[in-house]
UniProtKB/Swiss-Prot annotation:
Lineage of the species this protein comes from: Bacteria, Pseudomonadati, Thermodesulfobacteriota, Desulfobacteria, Desulfobacterales
EC number, as in UniProt: 2.7.7.6
GO biological process, one term: DNA-templated transcription
UniProt-recorded name of the protein: DNA-directed RNA polymerase subunit alpha
Alphabetical list of HAMAP family matching this protein: RNApol_bact_RpoA
Species whose genome carries this gene: Desulforapulum autotrophicum (strain ATCC 43914 / DSM 3382 / VKM B-1955 / HRM2)
Known role: DNA-dependent RNA polymerase catalyzes the transcription of DNA into RNA using the four ribonucleoside triphosphates as substrates.
Pfam family, one: RNA_pol_A_CTD
Quaternary structure (record): Homodimer. The RNAP catalytic core consists of 2 alpha, 1 beta, 1 beta' and 1 omega subunit. When a sigma factor is associated with the core the holoenzyme is formed, which can initiate transcription.
Classification via SMART domains: RPOLD
Residue span of region Alpha C-terminal domain (alpha-CTD): 256-340
Amino acid sequence: MSSDELVYMNWREIIMPEKVAVTTTSTYGKFVCEPLEKGYGITIGNSLRRIILSSLYGAAIVSVKFSEALHEYSVVSDVREDVSEIIMNLKEVKLKLDDPGDKILTINVKGEKFVTAADIISGDGRVEILNPEQHIATVSKGGELMMTMLVKTGKGYALAASNKDPEAPVGTIPIDSVFSPIKRVKYVVGASRIGQKTDYDKLTMEIWTDGSVTPEDSVAYAAKILKEQMNPFINFDEDIEPELVEKEHEGAAKNFNENLYRSVDELELSVRSSNCLKNAQILKIYQLVQKTDNEMLKTKNFGRKSLNEIKEVLTSMDLSLGMDLEGFEPPEEDQIKEGE
């Protein structure tokens, strides 16, 4: 083995995740990644979580100007809420922009009305209100509420002081802004199995967003950011690395579905099907999946109904009948029984 080959082993011999199982809606996502090397679950999970929470861009209202109020301690005639309460409500309005850049929003309400985010008017129509039901103010009969809001893009959380524009018109009130489109992120690290070894990591991440970005995209963007931040630490030319030649190493471990090691009792089959398997000495799922349809139908008292039942359950576990398990190693206790 050359010294170069020894260097390449540092990353070529690392266990890579087989896939990322994804369950998502427009605002919630669950991501299960396995198998990972021991310790990588925390390393990757914590890194992605911090980036998702701190580094993704979003849009928020950064200032507001009322027609008859000059500061946040003012009141607006015939409006139940004072200016500070209205500002608190504006901070809860969730926005999505079609393109970057500053946007102007307005509210022009006259007469008795329960004002919500649905009453916000976008001048160019390129701002989407994600929570139109958000309460803003309550205008009494004969009153009016007229105000102009400035929307900017940013990331994280910005205090009103940082949103203050010295060139803004008199009466413009800067407000605190929550730019992050992420509501919550959590991750859990569990155990994953490869063959007989169970000391690998399984990373499960859950993400809640405000709807301006999908959970899937938020993970993808965070992974891209992390990748770009790591690139400067690579001090060699990756393009000159030779192509990996696939070799069949004697005794090399293959990644097998962990359900293969479970008892057939865990399939929760009908009594008839369970008894047929026991009579045929099929006690573990790995023994079952190596049987073909025809072999199963030759089993005493085993019919087409039982066959379909078993095939349906196996499909839900990403398994099937007639599987080739070359290289599979049964649990030690099963090998001992077979040798007796």
